[in-house]
Amino acid sequence: MADLRASKRKQIRKERRKVADYGLEIETLTGADIKDEHIEAMWHFYRNTTARKWGEAYLKRRTFDELVDRCRDRLLMVMARDADRWVAGTFNLFKGEKIFGRYWGAAADYPGLHFECCYYRLIDYAIAGGMRIVEAGAQGEHKFLRGFVAKPTYSAHWLAHPSGRAAIERYLDGEREQMQNTIEGYNGVSPVKDVRSQGRTD
């Protein structure tokens, strides 16, 4: 927090107080603390979010079960409950000194709860565990306004058709430059003092 501009520190404290005033119980869970009820609730949140935003749920219910079976000790969930009902949650992975934020969903609208569950609670967990990096995922201007550094996100693809591959390579050459300019623009107005002064992308 000390690295942020005073106005952003004040904004974050205000956001966190607002969420606290809802009276929700927010739990940070990993390992054996993750139960079937959490996975079931997260599945419904995920479906609700994809129905509203993307239209296609590319993860299946069994994917969540398999992740729990194979990676339980690397899963980190932040779940919010109102009385006896789960109302929102995040599904994240961690390894070593990094947390990778992945899925958010909610059954009800609580302004600011997304930031609490997806960012602030993950940062709290990272600090408490001596972790260095919270990777909040691709996209979302609101991340940069809360102290995350804008940086490139990479993926790998192979296209068999030579003409298609050449056309996409040309497009990506132009997009790469545009994205670098966008990243520098975000970091140039970052609320983190040293990022803003250096326009850092790492």
Feature-to-residue mapping (PLM):
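Short, Φ-rich (hydrophobic/aromatic) sequence segments
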Residues: 1-4, 153, 167-171
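A conserved beta-strand-loop-helix scaffold within acyl/acetyltransferase catalytic domains
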Residues: 1-111, 158, 190-202
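A generic secondary-structure signal for well-formed alpha-helical elements
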Residues: 4, 8, 23, 46-54, ...
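Residue-level detector of functional hotspots within protein domains
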Residues: 10-14, 64-66, 85, 120-122, ...
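Glycine-rich loops and low-complexity Gly/Arg-rich segments
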Residues: 13-17, 50-54, 104, 115-117, ...
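Generic signal for short, ordered secondary-structure residues
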Residues: 21, 43-46, 105, 121-122, ...
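Acyl-donor binding region in acyl/amide transferases
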Residues: 96-162, 169
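Acidic/histidine-enriched, glycine/proline-rich intrinsically disordered or flexible terminal extensions
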Residues: 168, 172-202
